[in-house]
């Protein structure tokens, strides 16, 4: 398990953009992390005031950060950054609301030089909330 302090060492994100609370499982090419979604998230002020729903784009950002923790924790990538290069086949299946625990899985399926492709999914209570293929570049 990787706690929030180690996550903050790996990722350059700060509040309110740090969207990974804990890593539950990690292997060479796969990572499982969680985000506790609370009513105190700043985006709920405007999305939507009377019906708070986590924006889908932030779910995808949380998935990208999950993959980033795995990649940036590697010795050869310390001090580098991960940049979005693309998203494909993104689907949103379930609304994510305050009180949900978002379980995020990212699996690296292809690497070529500084480019990586990840299959990612986010679930709430075992039900798929979002999924997609993320492409990113590692750089500084």
Swiss-Prot record:
Keyword RNA-binding tagged: no
Taxonomy, superkingdom: Bacteria
Record field: catalytic activity: a (3R)-hydroxyacyl-[ACP] = a (2E)-enoyl-[ACP] + H2O
Biological process terms in GO annotation: fatty acid biosynthetic process; lipid A biosynthetic process
Active site: 47
GO molecular function terms noted in the UniProt entry: (3R)-hydroxyacyl-[acyl-carrier-protein] dehydratase activity
Keywords of this entry: Cytoplasm, Lipid A biosynthesis, Lipid biosynthesis, Lipid metabolism, Lyase
Broad class of the protein's primary localization: cytoplasm
GO cellular component: cytoplasm; membrane
SUPFAM superfamilies, per the entry: Thioesterase/thiol ester dehydrase-isomerase
Pfam families for this protein: FabA
Keyword Lipid metabolism: yes
EC number: 4.2.1.59
Compartment(s) of residence: Cytoplasm
Entry function: Involved in unsaturated fatty acids biosynthesis. Catalyzes the dehydration of short chain beta-hydroxyacyl-ACPs and long chain saturated and unsaturated beta-hydroxyacyl-ACPs.
Family in the record: Belongs to the thioester dehydratase family. FabZ subfamily.
HAMAP family according to UniProt: FabZ
Name of this chain's protein: 3-hydroxyacyl-[acyl-carrier-protein] dehydratase FabZ
Gene name of this polypeptide: fabZ
């Amino acid at each position: 398990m990787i706690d929030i302090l180690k996550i903050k060492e790996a990722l350059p994100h700060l509040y309110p953009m740090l969207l990974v609370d804990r890593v539950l499982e990690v292997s060479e090419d796969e990572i499982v992390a969680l985000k506790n979604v609370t009513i105190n998230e700043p985006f709920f002020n405007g999305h939507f005031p009377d019906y708070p729903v986590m924006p889908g784009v932030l779910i995808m950002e949380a998935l990208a950060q999950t993959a980033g923790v795995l990649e940036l924790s590697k010795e050869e990538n310390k001090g580098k950054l991960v940049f979005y290069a693309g998203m494909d086949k993104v689907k949103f299946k379930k609304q994510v609301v305050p009180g949900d625990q978002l379980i995020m899985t990212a699996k690296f399926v292809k690497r070529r030089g500084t480019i990586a492709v990840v299959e990612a999914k986010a679930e709430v209570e075992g039900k798929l909330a979002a999924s997609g293929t993320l492409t990113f570049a590692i750089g500084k």
